[in-house]
From Swiss-Prot:
Name recorded for this polypeptide: Elongation factor G
SUPFAM superfamilies documented for this protein: EF-G C-terminal domain-like, P-loop containing nucleoside triphosphate hydrolases, Ribosomal protein S5 domain 2-like, Translation proteins
PROSITE patterns registered for this protein in UniProt: G_TR_1, G_TR_2
Binding, GTP: 17-24, 81-85, 135-138
Taxonomic lineage from the root: Bacteria, Bacillati, Bacillota, Bacilli, Bacillales
Taxonomic superkingdom: Bacteria
Keywords per UniProt: Cytoplasm, Elongation factor, GTP-binding, Nucleotide-binding, Protein biosynthesis
One GO CC annotation: cytoplasm
Subcellular location: Cytoplasm
Gene that encodes it: fusA
Length: 693
C-alpha cells in the first residue's frame, strides 16, 4: 500500500506552553477544523478529546502527551499535545525529541510565563523550529504587543509578528495577515465563516510598519532579502514566505500569530502557518546515530522509505484494551504490522503485533508506517522509552534521551494483602511509562519508596494506581532526596587483612580523595605504577567505592561529586581476592569521612511566584523564612513576579500557604535546579533522625 501523504507534505509538530495558556483547547480546535472531531469539547468541562486520562479530565490539565494525526490542505499533521505543568517536563522533553517543529502557545495577558521559559529552553536544546500563537486575545487584559515584547525580553528570541489583531478583549474581531497584506474577519461563532476584506484605513499605517519590521527581522540572516530591503525594491509574497520558512527552519526566527482558540478565531490561519513555515521531515537535519557494536562509527538515518528501517520509541503507555502501547517516530524506512524488528539498544528481537495511528484515545489500525510518521505499536515487550528500533540487518542506535533523577520520595503501602501483588505490577508498569518515576524497596524498613519530580507528579501516579490498577494504598509523608559530598582533599589507606585458619583475605589500597565540581559525579583514576595492585583487582576497588558511596558516610545518603585516585597499595599472592579489595576500598572511604569534611547537600528548587503587588512584603518574608534566597523581581502586567531559590524540604504544602497569604490570588511554579550544602544545625538534625536518635 502506497503512502497517503508524501514526506514533503508531512508535519510532526508539538503544541507547548505554560499551564493554562489554552494549549489543549488550541489542539481541540485544530482537530475540529481538520474534521477529526465533530463536537468541540471544553477543557474546563472535562470533555476535551486530547485530555483522555481520568486524572486529566478531573484536574483540567494535560499530563501525557497524546499523539494524534490530522489533515489540512493536502498535508498530514501529526500533533503531540504536551503538558505545561513543570512536574511533567519529561513528557515535554521526550516529545520534543521526536518533533520537527512546534507551536508555542502564549496567554495574551501574561505573555511568556515560567514554564514557557523551561520548554523554550528544552526546544532550543533539541533545535526545534517554532511558531508562536498568542492565544486568549478575547481575555480581559489581553495585550498582543506586550506578549511579543516578552519573547524578546525573557527569551531573547528573534521574533516578529506575521499577523496583527484588530481589537482585543470583547472587541477582538479580525486578523491582519502581514505577509499577504490581507485582513480576515470572523462572522460566526464557530469560526468556520471568514470574510477576506481590505485592511481598514485606520490600520494600514500600523500594518505597513509591522511588515517592515518583519522583513528586517527575517532579513538578518538572508543576504538577498536584505539587499532588496535596503534598495527599497518590491518583495513579493512568495519571496517573503520562502525567507520566513528558511529562517524558521534554521531556528533563527520565530513568526508570531494571534487568535483565540476558545472563541474559534485564528486557528485555521495558524494551521496555514504550520504548513507554510514549519519544516517537513525532509527539511530538518537528518538524525545521526552510531553502530551498536562501534559507538565511534556514525550512521545517518535518512528520511527515505527505501532506506533501512530506524525508529525511536519515545513513549510507552498501558492501554486498558490493547495492553502495552509503544509510540515511536520513524526516521527512515518503513515498518509493516506482523513483522520483526530489532531493539538495538537492548539487542533484542521483537515482533510488532499491530500498528495503530492514534487520535487522542481512539485508534485506527494501519498496515504500514512510513518514514517521517508517528505511530503506536502493540506487542513490543522489551522496548522502553528512548530505545532504538531498527530492521534486523540494520545496526543503528539513535541518540537516546537523558532523564533527571527524582527529587522527592514517598513511602506507599498497600491497604490490604490482596493489594500487595497488584501494587507491585502497577509500579512496574508505571516505571515503564515514566522514566522519571522510580520505585524500590527500602532494605532496612521493608517499605516501598516511590520517587518523582514533584508533589503533583507523585499525587497523580498514586491516583492512577487507584483508578487504573484498583490498588488502594496508604501514602507516607514526602521525603527529600538528600546527598552527601566531601569539601576537603585527603590521602587515606584502606587495609583489609583477615587470617582465620586456611586461606586468608588481604587487600590494601591508598586513595587520594578530592572534591569534584558540582554535577561532576564520581570520577575514578587508576594511578598505580609497577603493579603494586594487580590490574585484575583495580575494577574491584572502583566497584567497592561505588557500592560504599551509595550509602554515604554521614546519614546514609548517596555520596556525589567526588574524585578518587588510587595511587598505591599492596597485595598477597595467595590471600588477595576481588572481595578483599572491594572491602579495602570501602574501608578507605570510611577513613576519608574523618578527614575530608563531609557535608549533606539538599535539592534547591527554582521557584517563581506571581501575585498582586500588595502581597509582595508577605511573600518575600515567607520566602526568607523558608531559607530561600530571592534572585530577582520584575513587574508582569499588573502583578509582581518573585524569582527565588528555596530548599525543597521547605516547600511542602507551599500551595496552601501561598493561597492564604495572597487570598487565593497568587500562583507559583517550581523545578529542581541544583544541590546545595545544608546549614550545620539542620544537617545535625538530619543525621540524628537517620540514626534513630
Amino acid at each position: 500500500m502506497a503512502r497517503d501523504f508524501s514526506l514533503k507534505n508531512t508535519r510532526n509538530i508539538g503544541i507547548m506552553a505554560h499551564i493554562d495558556a489554552g494549549k489543549t483547547t488550541t489542539t481541540e480546535r485544530i482537530l475540529y477544523y481538520t474534521g477529526r472531531i465533530h463536537k468541540i469539547g471544553e477543557t474546563h468541562e472535562g470533555a476535551s478529546q486530547m485530555d483522555w486520562m481520568e486524572q486529566e479530565q478531573d484536574r483540567g490539565i494535560t499530563i501525557t502527551s497524546a499523539a494524534t494525526t490530522a489533515q489540512w490542505q493536502g498535508h498530514r499533521v501529526n500533533i503531540i499535545d504536551t503538558p505545561g505543568h513543570v512536574d511533567f517536563t519529561v513528557e515535554v522533553e521526550r516529545s520534543l525529541r521526536v518533533l520537527d517543529g512546534a507551536v508555542t502557545v502564549l496567554d495574551a495577558q501574561s505573555g511568556v510565563e515560567p514554564q514557557t521559559e523551561t520548554v523554550w529552553r528544552q526546544a532550543t536544546t533539541y533545535g526545534v523550529p517554532r511558531i508562536v500563537f498568542v492565544n486568549k486575545m478575547d481575555k480581559l487584559g489581553a495585550n498582543f504587543e506586550y506578549s511579543v515584547s516578552t519573547l524578546h525580553d525573557r527569551l531573547q528570541a528573534n521574533a516578529a509578528p506575521i499577523q496583527l489583531p484588530i481589537g482585543a478583549e470583547d472587541e477582538f474581531e479580525a486578523i491582519i495577515d502581514l505577509v499577504e497584506m490581507k485582513c480576515f474577519k470572523y462572522t460566526n461563532d464557530l469560526g468556520t465563516e471568514i470574510d477576506e476584506i481590505e485592511i481598514p484605513e485606520d490600520h494600514k499605517e500600523r500594518a505597513e510598519e509591522a511588515r517592515a519590521q518583519l522583513i528586517e527581522a527575517v532579513a538578518e540572516n538572508n543576504d538577498d532579502l536584505m539587499e532588496k530591503y535596503l534598495g527599497d525594491e518590491e518583495i513579493s509574497v512568495d519571496e517573503l514566505k520562502d525567507a520566513i520558512r528558511q529562517a524558521t527552519t534554521d531556528v533563527e526566527f520565530y513568526p508570531v500569530l494571534c487568535g483565540t482558540a476558545f472563541k474559534n478565531k485564528g486557528v485555521q490561519l495558524m494551521l496555514n502557518a504550520v504548513i507554510d513555515y514549519l519544516p517537513s521531515p525532509l527539511d530538518v537535519k537528518p538524525i545521526i546515530g552510531h553502530r551498536a557494536n562501534n559507538p565511534d562509527e556514525e550512521v545517518v538515518a535518512k528520511p527515505d522509505d527505501s532506506a533501512e528501517f530506524a525508529a525511536l520509541a519515545f513513549k510507552v503507555m498501558t492501554d486498558p484494551y490493547v495492553g502495552k502501547l509503544t509510540f515511536f517516530r520513524v526516521y527512515s524506512g518503513t515498518l509493516s504490522s506482523g513483522s520483526y524488528v530489532k531493539n538495538s539498544s537492548k539487542d533484542k528481537r521483537e515482533r510488532v503485533g499491530r500498528l495503530l495511528q492514534m487520535h487522542a484515545n481512539s485508534r485506527q489500525e494501519i498496515d504500514t508506517v512510513y518514514s517521517g510518521e508517528i505511530a503506536a505499536a502493540v506487542g513490543l515487550k522489551e522496548t522502553g522509552t528512548g530505545d532504538t528500533l531498527c530492521g534486523e540487518k540494520n545496526d543503528i542506535i539513535l541518540e537516546s534521551m537523558e532523564f533527571p533523577e527524582p527529587v522527592i520520595h514517598l513511602s506507599v503501602e498497600p491497604k490490604s494483602k490482596a493489594d500487595q501483588d497488584k501494587m507491585t505490577q502497577a509500579l512496574v508498569k508505571l516505571q515503564e511509562e515514566d522514566p522519571t518515576f522510580h520505585a524500590h524497596t527500602d532494605e532496612e524498613t521493608g517499605q516501598v519508596i516511590i520517587g518523582g519530580m514533584g508533589e503533583l507528579h507523585l499525587d497523580i501516579l498514586v491516583d492512577r494506581m487507584k483508578k487504573e490498577f484498583n490498588v488502594e494504598c496508604n501514602v507516607g509523608a514526602p521525603m527529600v532526596s538528600y546527598r552527601e559530598t566531601f569539601k576537603q582533599p585527603a590521602q587515606v589507606q584502606g587495609k583489609f587483612s583477615r587470617q582465620s585458619g586456611g586461606r586468608g583475605q588481604y587487600g590494601d589500597v591508598h586513595i587520594e580523595f578530592t572534591p569534584n565540581e558540582t554535577g561532576g559525579g564520581f570520577e575514578f583514576e587508576n594511578a598505580i605504577v609497577g603493579g603494586v595492585v594487580p590490574r585484575e583487582y583495580i575494577p574491584s576497588v572502583e566497584q567497592g567505592l561505588k557500592d560504599a558511596m551509595e550509602n554515604g558516610v554521614l546519614a546514609g545518603y548517596p555520596l556525589i561529586d567526588v574524585k578518587a585516585k588510587l595511587f598505591d597499595g599492596s597485595y598477597h599472592d595467595v590471600d588477595s581476592s576481588e572481595m578483599a579489595f572491594k572491602i579495602a576500598a570501602s574501608l578507605a572511604l570510611k577513613e576519608a569521612a574523618k578527614k575530608c569534611d563531609p557535608v549533606i547537600l539538599e535539592p534547591m528548587m527554582k521557584v517563581t511566584i506571581e501575585m498582586p503587588e500588595e502581597y509582595m512584603g508577605d511573600i518575600m518574608g515567607d520566602v526568607t523564612a523558608r531559607r530561600g534566597r530571592v534572585d530577582g523581581m520584575e513587574p508582569r502586567g499588573n502583578a509582581q513576579v518573585v524569582n527565588a531559590y528555596v530548599p525543597l524540604s521547605e516547600m511542602f504544602g507551599y500551595a496552601t500557604s501561598l493561597r492564604s497569604n495572597t487570598q487565593g490570588r497568587g500562583t507559583y511554579t517550581m523545578y529542581f535546579d541544583h544541590y546545595a550544602e545544608v546549614p550545620k544545625s539542620i544537617a545535625e538534625e538530619i543525621i540524628k533522625k537517620n540514626k534513630g536518635e
